[in-house]
C-alpha cells in the first residue's frame, strides 16, 4: 500500500463545463435518422457526459493511480474472504487478514469511494440530465445499483435513500428497503431503455463517455436485466420478500424473459477508451506491492478438477515440479518475511486486463439455480449448468475437453503448503463436476455454486456475497490468529463494520442504525438481511 508515482493514469477531469442550452425535444419526437444522434443532443450531453466514466471507474474502485482504494475495498475484502486470493503483506497477526476488521481503517474505504465519488456523480446526472436525457439517466441508475448493491452487501444498512437531500446527518435505511429501491430503479431504467431502443435502434449518444459498452444501449439493457436476476437470487432465502407485489421468483423470471447476458461479447467489462486509461489495480497489488498471491481454496478446488482455467487465472510459482507449479497460501498466515510467499502463484491479471463486473457464465449459473428452485429460467438445470461452464472456458480461451463428464476421481484435494510456508490442510469438500440428477438438492446446489465461483474469478466481492448466501463453495477456516476478539468465526466475516468516519460525522444516525438494524452490535459476525439460509 505505497504511493505509486510512476504509473501514468489518464483520468477524466470533472472541471468546469460550459452549460450549453439544448434545443432538443424528447427523443421520441426526433424527426431524424433513428440510428444517429442529433448534434444538439450531443452538445447537451456535455453537461453530464463526463460523470459517467466517473461512476464507471468506481463501481469496482479503479480510479486512484496507486490502487490503495481497490486494495482496501476489494482485494483485502471480497477477494480475500471469497477464497480467491491470500494477502502476503507483512501487516502482522492483528490485521484484517486475521479478522480485525477495523484494522488501519481498511473498512472505511468502500463506503468512502461510493459516497464521495460515485454518488455525487450520479447526483449531477440526476439534477442536470434526468428530464432532458432520460435514456442517459437510465444508464446512471443502472450504474448506481451496480455500485451500491456491492456496498450494501459489504456493510448492510446505508445512508442511501436520502443521499443529497441536505441536513447535517443522513439517516440509514434497512438493507431490505435499499434492495427494494434497486428493483424499482432497475425496472424504470429497463423501461426507459426499451422505449429508446424501439425508436432509435443503434443510436449511441453516450459513446464518447461509456467505458463499458461504448454507448450500446442494447447491451446496457441486458446488463440491467442480468443485474436484476443477480439481486433477485440474492433474496432467495428471504421469506415473503416482495417488491410491488412481485416475489423474488417473479422478479427473476421477468429479467430472464426480458433478456439477460448470454454471450461473452456482452460481458460487463471496464476498459480503456475515449482518452481514459483503465489500469487494472490488481496488477499493482500483486506486482508493484507483492501483497497478494493465489488462495489455498482455489488451488484445492481447481487442482482437484485438473481445471485448465487454473493456468489462465494464475502464473506458475517458483515451487514444485513440472506439471505442479501452481501454489497458493492459506488465509491467516502471519507473514513476517515475504521471501518464501512471494514465490507463490500470482494472478494473471495485467495492466490492460479489463475490470470484470459480470460475465455470461455467472448468468447461466444464476439461471441454473433458479430452475433448480422451480423458477422458469428458459432452460433445464443441467443444460444451464453446462452452458455456464462452457461459456467460462470460452471466455478464458481454455480447452473444455472431457471436463463436463469427469468422474468421481476429480474433486477438491488436500492443500499442501510449500516449503517455508504454512497451512497444510485436508480438503473440506468432495463435490465433483459432472451433473447428477440423482444427487440430493444440497449437493446439486453446491455443485452449481462451486462452478459459478470458479467462473466469476477474479471478482471476489460477488463471490464472497454468494458464499455468505449459500455456504458454497466450502472454504478452509482461517489459519492462525483470529484477531476479532470473538466477533468473527474462523469461517469468515458476514459483513464489515461501519466506517469510523460515520461515527465522527453521522454519529446519531449510525448509532441508531446499529441499534435498529444490527441488534446493537456493529460486528463482523452480524448477518446481513439476505444472509438467511
Label every model-predicted segment.
Residues 67-71, 313-316, 460-469:
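Short coil/turn segments at secondary-structure boundaries
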Residues 42, 86-143, 147-402, 437-446, ...:
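Structured, solvent-exposed acidic/aromatic patches
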Residues 23-83, 124, 473, 485-533:
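Membrane-proximal, proline-rich intrinsically disordered regions
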Residues 1-21:
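Sec-dependent bacterial lipoprotein signal peptides
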Residues 17, 58, 62, 391:
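Phosphate/oxyanion-binding loops and surfaces in catalytic or ligand/nucleic-acid-binding neighborhoods
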Residues 31, 344-346, 424-429:
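Short acidic (Asp/Glu) and glycine-rich catalytic loops that position anionic groups and cofactors
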Residues 397-533:
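C-terminal functional modules
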Amino acid at each position: 500500500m505505497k504511493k505509486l508515482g510512476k504509473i501514468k493514469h489518464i483520468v477524466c477531469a470533472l472541471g468546469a463545463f460550459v452549460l450549453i442550452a439544448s434545443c432538443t425535444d424528447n427523443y421520441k419526437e426526433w424527426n431524424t435518422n433513428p440510428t444517429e444522434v442529433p448534434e444538439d443532443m450531443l452538445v447537451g450531453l456535455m453537461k453530464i457526459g463526463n460523470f459517467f466514466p466517473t461512476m464507471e471507474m468506481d463501481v469496482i474502485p479503479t480510479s486512484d493511480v496507486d490502487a490503495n482504494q481497490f486494495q482496501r475495498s476489494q482485494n483485502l475484502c471480497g477477494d480475500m474472504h471469497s477464497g480467491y486470493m491470500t494477502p502476503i503483506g507483512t501487516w502482522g497477526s492483528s490485521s484484517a487478514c486475521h479478522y480485525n476488521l477495523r484494522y488501519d481503517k481498511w473498512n472505511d474505504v468502500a463506503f468512502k469511494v461510493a459516497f464521495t465519488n460515485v454518488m455525487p456523480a450520479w447526483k449531477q446526472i440526476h439534477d442536470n440530465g434526468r428530464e432532458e436525457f432520460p435514456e442517459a439517466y437510465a444508464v446512471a441508475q443502472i450504474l448506481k445499483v451496480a455500485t451500491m448493491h456491492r456496498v450494501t452487501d459489504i456493510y448492510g444498512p446505508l445512508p442511501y435513500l436520502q443521499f443529497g437531500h441536505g441536513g447535517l446527518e443522513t439517516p440509514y435505511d434497512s438493507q431490505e428497503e435499499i434492495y427494494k429501491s434497486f428493483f424499482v430503479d432497475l425496472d424504470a431504467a429497463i423501461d426507459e431503455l426499451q422505449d429508446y431502443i424501439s425508436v432509435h435502434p443503434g443510436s449511441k449518444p453516450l459513446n464518447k463517455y461509456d467505458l463499458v459498452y461504448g454507448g450500446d444501449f442494447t447491451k446496457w439493457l441486458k446488463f440491467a436485466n442480468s443485474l436484476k436476476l443477480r439481486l433477485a437470487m440474492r433474496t432467495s432465502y428471504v421469506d415473503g420478500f416482495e417488491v410491488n407485489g412481485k416475489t423474488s421468483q417473479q422478479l427473476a423470471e421477468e429479467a430472464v424473459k426480458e433478456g439477460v447476458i448470454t454471450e461473452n461479447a456482452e460481458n460487463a467489462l471496464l476498459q480503456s477508451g475515449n482518452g481514459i486509461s483503465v489500469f487494472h489495480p490488481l496488477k499493482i497489488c500483486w506486482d508493484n506491492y507483492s501483497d497478494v498471491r493465489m488462495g489455498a481454496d482455489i488451488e484445492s478446488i481447481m487442482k482437484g478438477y485438473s481445471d485448465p482455467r487454473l493456468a489462465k487465472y494464475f502464473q506458475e510459482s517458483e515451487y514444485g515440479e513440472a506439471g505442479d507449479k501452481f501454489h497458493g497460501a492459506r488465509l491467516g498466515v502471519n507473514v513476517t518475511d515475504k521471501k518464501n510467499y512471494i514465490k507463490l502463484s500470482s494472478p494473471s491479471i495485467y495492466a490492460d486486463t479489463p475490470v470484470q463486473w459480470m460475465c455470461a457464465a455467472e448468468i447461466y449459473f444464476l439461471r441454473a439455480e433458479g430452475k433448480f428452485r422451480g423458477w422458469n429460467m428458459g432452460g433445464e438445470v443441467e443444460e444451464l449448468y453446462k452452458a455456464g461452464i462452457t461459456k467460462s472456458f470460452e471466455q478464458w480461451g481454455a480447452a473444455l475437453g472431457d471436463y463436463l463428464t469427469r468422474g468421481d476421481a476429480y474433486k477438491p484435494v488436500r492443500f499442501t503448503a510449500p516449503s517455508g510456508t504454512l497451512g497444510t490442510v485436508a480438503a473440506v469438500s468432495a463435490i465433483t463436476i459432472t451433473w447428477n440428477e440423482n444427487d440430493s438438492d444440497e449437493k446439486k446446489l453446491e455443485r452449481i455454486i462451486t462452478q459459478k465461483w470458479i467462473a466469476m474469478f477474479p471478482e471476489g466481492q460477488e463471490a464472497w456475497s454468494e458464499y455468505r448466501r449459500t455456504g458454497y463453495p466450502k472454504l478452509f477456516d482461517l489459519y492462525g490468529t483470529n484477531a476479532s476478539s470473538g466477533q468473527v468465526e474462523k469461517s469468515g466475516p458476514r459483513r464489515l463494520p461501519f466506517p469510523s468516519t460515520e461515527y465522527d460525522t453521522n454519529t446519531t444516525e449510525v448509532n441508531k442504525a446499529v441499534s435498529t438494524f444490527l441488534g446493537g452490535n456493529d460486528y463482523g459476525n452480524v448477518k446481513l438481511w439476505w444472509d438467511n439460509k
